[in-house]
């Protein structure tokens, strides 16, 4: 009976999409409650500047994305709204932070280890009298 009432409010075709949306909103709500449980200053004190930037960017992106969804649910085209430009601006900064993170993770040359590796990898002939005699014999002919 309750299922029949639901079908009167919206088309049956979108029931699965609405259920998924409701589930996603519940997950977002849980995450926001978790984030809000800790004071922002307390959270940022535990992080290095790069991690702080990541938290700020993810927060800004999340809020703007939620506003994008809100606009869409109100029948406003978010692609024509300034929120699209704001999301692009945040993406640019996220890419910059990613580049910095990747540079930090990039392999660094350990000169001592490289020197030892090259030294041990190069072939050195052993000092024996036989190869010298063979070489002398070849050079005379």
UniProtKB/Swiss-Prot annotation:
Inducers of expression: Up-regulated during adipocyte and myogenic differentiation.
Keywords: Apoptosis, Cytoplasm, DNA-binding, Isopeptide bond, Nucleus, Phosphoprotein, Repressor, RNA-binding, rRNA processing, Transcription, Transcription regulation, Ubl conjugation
Free-text tissue specificity from the UniProt record: Kidney, heart, brain, spleen, lung, testis, liver and small intestine.
Cell compartments where the protein resides: Nucleus; Cytoplasm; Nucleus, Nucleolus
UniProt cross-link Glycyl lysine isopeptide (Lys-Gly) (interchain with G-Cter in SUMO2), position: 119, 126, 132
Pfam families: Sas10_Utp3
Region called Interaction with NCOR1 and NCOR2, residue ranges: 100-141
Region called Interaction with NR1D1, residue ranges: 50-100
Post-translational modification: Phosphorylated by PRKDC.
GO cellular component terms, A-Z: cytoplasm; nucleolus; nucleoplasm; transcription repressor complex
InterPro entries: Exosome-assoc_fac/DNA_repair, Sas10/Utp3/C1D
Similarity-based family: Belongs to the C1D family.
Role this protein plays: Plays a role in the recruitment of the RNA exosome complex to pre-rRNA to mediate the 3'-5' end processing of the 5.8S rRNA; this function may include MPHOSPH6. Can activate PRKDC not only in the presence of linear DNA but also in the presence of supercoiled DNA. Can induce apoptosis in a p53/TP53 dependent manner. May regulate the TRAX/TSN complex formation. Potentiates transcriptional repression by NR1D1 and THRB.
Name this polypeptide is given: Nuclear nucleic acid-binding protein C1D
Organism: Mus musculus (Mouse)
Gene it is expressed from: C1d
């Amino acid at each position: 009976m309750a299922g029949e009432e639901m079908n009167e409010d919206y088309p049956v075709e979108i029931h699965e999409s609405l259920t998924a949306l409701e589930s996603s909103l519940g997950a977002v709500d849980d995450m926001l409650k978790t984030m809000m449980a800790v004071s922002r200053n307390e959270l940022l004190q535990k992080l290095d500047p790069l991690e702080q930037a990541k938290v700020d960017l993810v927060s800004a992106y999340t809020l703007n994305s939620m506003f994008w969804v809100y606009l869409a649910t109100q029948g406003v085209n978010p692609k024509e709204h300034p929120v699209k430009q704001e999301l692009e601006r945040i993406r640019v900064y996220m890419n910059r932070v990613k580049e910095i993170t990747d540079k930090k993770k990039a392999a660094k040359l350990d000169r001592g280890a490289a020197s030892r590796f090259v030294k041990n990898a190069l072939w050195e002939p052993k000092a024996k009298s036989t190869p010298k005699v063979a070489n002398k014999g070849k050079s005379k002919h």
